[in-house]
């Protein structure tokens, strides 16, 4: 398998209004997490942190030049493996235990991490052979109705279980923008995880349909939909 240098592991795409997409282009699309950086006047938010194979802080030092809230949309390995790099870590109570004590089973890493996940490796062939998600206990628990105040913009927490019990989305009412986590994305439905619940999933989708959404920034597949 191809080897790529660590400084090529991430790609960043800057959108409008202080929103940036970070992703790992050498992770195959089905497994690739879209990480969203949202810039505010006083602090920033990073929604999810990817596979953890390469350090976000080392390769993208601008992420921590300002106060940063690292939010876990849920605690599957491909969304939280970089969370240990950040001082402020936010998660829903239903999955806080996984963030604090992750293993190959509760994060789904054992089921998915392998050759089929990658187009290339970051300077270490078979580096996933000893892959593990490092513990990153939540420093703040967030739930339905909580608000992340960035100074000049506000993100409201929506509890959207179904894909997992502690799944959350972030809603910016002022711009009608939804950061949907894995509850809405452009790709095949994957709802056979040990803690997925289709009834909860349907209920979450129904409540999201009531929002006046203009833009969805999803976590898998095509980054944004209008």
Q: Which residues make up each language-model segment?
A:
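Hydrophobic/aromatic beta-strand patches that form the interior of the parallel beta-sheet core
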Residues: 20-22, 69-71, 90, 140-142, ...
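Active-site micro-motifs of SAM-dependent methyltransferase domains
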Residues: 21, 78, 96-97, 166, ...
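A general structural motif
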Residues: 42, 65-67, 213
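Metallo-beta-lactamase
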Residues: 44-46, 51-52, 133, 137-140, ...
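Conserved beta-strand hairpin/beta-sheet module of binuclear metal-dependent hydrolase folds
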Residues: 8-62, 169-181, 185
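Active-site HxH/HxHxD metal-binding segment of metal-dependent hydrolases
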Residues: 51-148
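Short Pro/Gly-enriched beta-strand edge/turn motifs at strand-loop
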Residues: 16-23, 126-131, 151-153
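Basic/polar N-terminal segments that are highly enriched at the extreme N-terminus
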Residues: 1-8
